[in-house]
Amino acid sequence: MFKFRSHNEQNTEQIVDKHALIFGLISVFLCGIGFSIIAPVVPFLVQPYISNPGEQAIVVTLLTSVYAFCVFFAAPVLGALSDKYGRRPLLLVCLLGSAIGYLVFGIGGALWVLFAGRIIEGITGGSISTIFAYFADIIPPEQRTKYFGWVSAVVGVGTVIGPTLGGLLAKFGYSVPMYFGAVITLLNVVYGFFFMPESLDKKHRLKEITFVRLNPFTQLANLLSMKNLNRLLVSAFLLWIPNGSLQAVFSQFTMDTFGWKPALIGLMFSIMGFQDIISQGFIMPKLLIKLNDKQIAILGMVSEIIGYSLIALSTLFSFYPLFIAGMFIFGFGDSIFGPSFNGMLSKSVDSSEQGRIQGGSQSIQALARMIGPIIGGQIYVSLGHAAPAFMGMILIAAAIPVLYKRTNINEDFAKIS
């Protein structure tokens, strides 16, 4: 058993069964594998239906946008439901939906079936916000940034294994990684059903759910109306747009620019995942000793700009070592931005609102990842392969002063209730 001092108003002691931590870590680990295992093969699954490389790039990015579109509408609903009914049932349902989505995407047979699979995954894709709310329930506020860093490192372990495994499994058929992703997600559901404890006790649950909590647009308006929260979210939004674009075009980009195959693409994803582990598991704790959350976030954003610059240069000179160096520096920045952002965000609310704020944050991220791939796909085809990287440099450079001027968010979140 692990003991943590409760972070609610009563300041009572909270006892957390070890399975709470184990299940949460296993969940994010398998989410890392499940999500990353399919990344190297998506363009190759689209290829049988569309032969033109330009149109293929558009469809690949649209598949990402459709997923994000569904997450945008589903995340606040799932967050509110988890605040009222608890994290456990929502997590299990979401994980089951993800497994079904992987299965449908793998079966394929027509382009619309691929989109159907992504839609199913997107509707249940709010599980990530629920998992972060789950950890926020059991971790004291002053330790959350550190633990969110470890959670991200565990995801990194999954993303080390997933892409390489996906690239290897693709040798037996491009759909095989999807089936494998479905199987490991179902195993997580089974483990959670028997061993996962509830993290949000009934006395701290939401009493009722209003339409405001379920409407993503109202949710966004309420969140952005908070003077101490809006700059944090706007800066993250500006960062997530190009990052969503890069994620969507990565496989297509490496295939078109450097002629990479699924195994090599998967290996690159895995190397990036290993870099995540180093950054979040070893570098992040040392940064927290000397810097606060905001300073770490800004350091991450500057690193991403440098990374995007090298990615753009690699395209202009067709020199893949520059691309690899750029991805490493970009990955470092992204690795330290995420935990610091989630740390700042989670400290702004009490336990009964964690699902809501995390769901609202995921809706904003989903909106960015819906817009980013669409813009990225269009400029990739019309302006050249370096265009998404230039977009990243410009938007993140604009985001830094927005975040730098933000005030302390620990004050007045109660207005949003």
Locate predicted features.
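Central cavity-lining transmembrane alpha-helices of secondary-active solute carriers
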Residues: 62-78, 270-283
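Short amphipathic helix-loop junctions that connect adjacent transmembrane helices
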Residues: 41-57, 248-265
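Juxtamembrane intracellular "pre-TM" segments in multi-pass secondary transporters
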Residues: 5-18, 197-235, 257
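Cytoplasmic helix-loop-helix junction between adjacent transmembrane helices
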Residues: 117-156
